[in-house]
């Protein structure tokens, strides 16, 4: 569903930010 896609994109975004901070 749409919510699953939103959560998936949010997880990718958070992961990208975390990797950028490291």
From Swiss-Prot:
GO biological process, one term: defense response to bacterium
Tissue occurrence: Expressed by the skin parotoid and/or rostral glands.
Keywords: Amidation, Amphibian defense peptide, Antibiotic, Antimicrobial, Secreted
Modified residues (Lysine amide): 22
GO cellular component term, pick one: extracellular region
Chief place of localization: secreted
Subcellular location: Secreted
Assigned protein family: Belongs to the frog skin active peptide (FSAP) family. Caerin subfamily.
Record's function text: Antibacterial peptide, that adopts an alpha helical conformation which can disrupt bacterial membranes. Each caerin displays a different antimicrobial specificity.
Name listed for the protein in its UniProt record: Caerin-3.2
Lineage of producing organism: Eukaryota, Metazoa, Chordata, Craniata, Vertebrata
